[in-house]
Amino acid sequence: MSVDEKPIKIKVEKVSKIFGKQTKKAVQMLANGKTKKEILKATGSTVGVNQADFEVYDGEIFVIMGLSGSGKSTLVRMLNRLIEPTAGNIYIDGDMITNMSKDQLREVRRKKISMVFQKFALFPHRTILENTEYGLELQGVDKQERQQKALESLKLVGLEGFEHQYPDQLSGGMQQRVGLARALTNDPDILLMDEAFSALDPLIRKDMQDELLDLHDNVGKTIIFITHDLDEALRIGDRIVLMKDGNIVQIGTPEEILMNPSNEYVEKFVEDVDLSKVLTAGHIMKRAETVRIDKGPRVALTLMKNLGISSIYAVDKQKKLLGVIYASDAKKAAESDLSLQDILNTEFTTVPENTYLTEIFDVVSDANIPIAVVDEKQRMKGIVVRGALIGALAGNNEYINAEGTNEQTQDPSAQEVK
């Protein structure tokens, strides 16, 4: 399903937050294009968020990032009205939450939205299980039911067996998992995560990012993730919002942010990113010419001659990759009346589309033929050649497929290892 076909989970329309007294005047000045500094000087009020406008799709990991003071935490707290918007509207599943009563809002917070903060805020005198079930306890849920749900959530985050421990017996990373489990116990549609991993050591932080991605694959929640770390945003986000001084300066996929920055600020923000840890084989693969295994060696020879290559991948009728045919072997087979199956070489390397370039650099460098890119059914999707890998790592857009898939016809010469 394409992004455009996914149902909209959250819709934010021209939402602003003004801190101060002259909010109406400040909102009008924003509408007239005045800057944050101009509004502060004229009204004494501070612009926290300026006319934010975006949609979040169901099941998406939507990252809001920016430096300190950019407005990202203010924005996420307006999504559940922990901070009241000064202007604009917010919809969840089509329901406008900005005009809900306290009772209606309380119901939304209980059933649809949970929040995970940077500080774990666990009760030291309660066990891990008791901390995890606390939200359901406040709702008056039966003890047996809430403990069962809490145990299921702890299992999801890898803490099965720790339910009778106390917070001070757990590491920082494990405590943050408890916070995540507590949020999941309510079975919300939406998780708001505000700098949830920022206080953790780098190695633990990466583990938690992996845990979050695995969890997302398993339960499919819509996640709004706040961070100031670009590497973290690029690693986990389906789409990223970049903020500065309360303004949204760009919204896009990680690839769009990296390869097509909207202005100089974004360009500087991403200039030091290690592309090898962001781009994948799918971003640089080219269309692969192949030969069906049921064709004869003369067909394979003709294809290779026309393409100017010395080897070609062989596939079956379903495009499943079977092996490599070398020109020298095909020539001998044609002279000896052998089939392609008789000369099929099955010693070759494949990589999935989502393999990061940092993981395939050595493989591509050592290979004497292009590396085959395959899907989960071992069907041929494309090839990676050395020249494209080097060009992409150098930041040359010519070698990068915008959406991480190969949609363009390749120059046959690209089949050769260069």
From Swiss-Prot:
ATP binds at residues 66-73. GO terms for molecular function: ABC-type quaternary ammonium compound transporting activity; ATP binding; ATP hydrolysis activity. InterPro entries: AAA+_ATPase (IPR003593), ABC_osmolyte_uptake_ATP-bind (IPR051921), ABC_transporter-like_ATP-bd (IPR003439), ABC_transporter-like_CS (IPR017871), CBS_dom (IPR000644), CBS_dom_sf (IPR046342), Gly-betaine_transp_ATP-bd (IPR005892), P-loop_NTPase (IPR027417). It catalyses: a quaternary ammonium(out) + ATP + H2O = a quaternary ammonium(in) + ADP + phosphate + H(+). Residues 34-270 form the ABC transporter domain. GO terms for cellular component: membrane. It comes from the Bacteria. The keyword ATP-binding applies. GO terms for biological process: amino acid transport; glycine betaine transport. Keywords: Amino-acid transport, ATP-binding, CBS domain, Nucleotide-binding, Repeat, Translocase, Transport. SUPFAM superfamilies: CBS-domain pair, P-loop containing nucleoside triphosphate hydrolases. Its EC number is 7.6.2.9. SMART domains: AAA, CBS. Pfam families: ABC_tran, CBS. Residues 284-340, 344-403 form the CBS domain. It is an enzyme of class 7 (translocase). Belongs to the ABC transporter superfamily. The complex is composed of two ATP-binding proteins (OpuAA), two transmembrane proteins (OpuAB) and a solute-binding protein (OpuAC). Involved in a multicomponent binding-protein-dependent transport system for glycine betaine. Probably responsible for energy coupling to the transport system. This is Glycine betaine transport ATP-binding protein OpuAA. The lineage of its organism: Bacteria, Bacillati, Bacillota, Bacilli, Bacillales.
